[in-house]
Amino acid sequence: MAQYLLSVYQPDGPAPAPDFLEPIMRDVEALNRDMKAADAWVFGAGLHPTETATVVRQQGAEVLITDGPFAEAKEHVGGFTVIEAADLDAALGWAEKLARATTLPIEVRPIQH
């Protein structure tokens, strides 16, 4: 089976209020249980806010280390799930369920091995 990265994109800004976020997290946990029961779930995690990011890049002969995200954007990767699926259509099916659970855009990309 192929593996796919499901990236969850969230808008920049403060975290949602707990009363908004708690039902979403319950739905995500239920979906994760469904993925595990179907042997589709490999790994997943949420990410700390973008202000905790550090970027390392080569510039000429030097390596530069800077605080913050790589690029300014209106949204950023806030979490991800790695799944195994028979094909892209099956991966898109899981991504649709994740988009409904999170109410956020999900990017689906095959993983190279």
Regions found by a protein language model. Name each.
Residues 1-113:
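Conserved, structured core segments of small domains
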